[in-house]
Amino acid sequence: VESVYSLHGSVSPLKAICALCKKYSAHLIVDEAHALGVFGNIGEGYVASLGLQNDVSATVYAFGKALGIHGAAVGGKAILKDYLINFSRPFIYTTA
């Protein structure tokens, strides 16, 4: 789900979505492309501004919107990091 919808600038009902994910044991991936640099004490995004970091399975930060640079990052728990390191083909074969 997107945390902030670019067309209208409206925010997602993340607290309600997180509650549903808990109820049904679902994982939630949040796209923070339009919230990064805007929400939170230091611009860390809408998820952090609501204090939902532990309720979200993965947070995707695209740097091309607010930061105006190339690249992106995925935030999540250690198990997600280990999975991405070991199974993301473009990452596996990099040497940098």
Placement of each model-derived feature along the sequence:
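Active-site phosphate-binding strand-loop segment of PLP-dependent enzymes
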Residues: 1-30
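Active-site C-terminal subdomain of aminotransferase-like
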Residues: 24-27, 34, 39-96
